[in-house]
Amino acid sequence: STSRRQRQMCIRDSMAIVQRFAVLNRATMAAIIIKGMGFTEVNRFETIHNYIDFSRMILRKGAVSAELGEKLLIPINMRDGSLICVGKGNPDWNYSAPHGAGRLMSRSKAKELLSMEEYQESMNGIYTTSVSRATIDEAPQAYKSMEEIKNAITDTVEIVDTIKPIYNFKASD
């Protein structure tokens, strides 16, 4: 019979393989988009959320690594963009930062309470074909504000820039 230790090693190895596959998958998608759009890549960094950090044995659910000097991205919403940050390596935060702004309301509450008119108006100035009833749960109004997040993360990251979208795509299931 398989020992407990062998099962744990199998799970760990499987998770490591899946996480490596995800890294390669993101790199492949980026390469296809860059080539298809005729862009030149200037800089790249990767921020992963919802994974196991085997080096520190930290399960990051809704969180990303924020090791000392590590560049990371914290998405806010589809209108306001994302924060580019550098980690402070704060052990009180498990060397982590939030993966995003966090919801003000559940997906079902957003579908119930938010209006299409308000959603459409909030996306003025950003090219998108994704604003619809099917994506209203992702409306900017469903998330905490950028200011609230900026104020909450000072112990774990230094904010170095804010990037604002000019194009947004959100698949509707």
Where are these regions (language model features)?
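Long, Lys/Arg- and hydrophobic-enriched amphipathic alpha-helices
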Residues: 123-173
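Flexible loop/turn segments at secondary-structure boundaries
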Residues: 53-55, 81-83, 92-93, 104-106, ...
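Conserved active-site and cofactor/substrate-binding residues in soluble primary-metabolism enzymes
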Residues: 20, 24, 28, 92, ...
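A glycine-rich phosphate-binding loop feature that marks nucleotide/adenosyl-phosphate handling sites
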Residues: 8, 42-60, 139-145, 164-173
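Single conserved hydrophobic/aromatic residue that forms the stacking wall/gate
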Residues: 1-11
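Hydrophobic alpha-helical scaffolding
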Residues: 15-23, 109, 135-139
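Accessory "access/gating" subregions that flank catalytic or transport cores
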Residues: 12-88
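Catalytic phosphate/nucleotide-handling subdomain of diverse soluble enzymes
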Residues: 90-93, 97-126
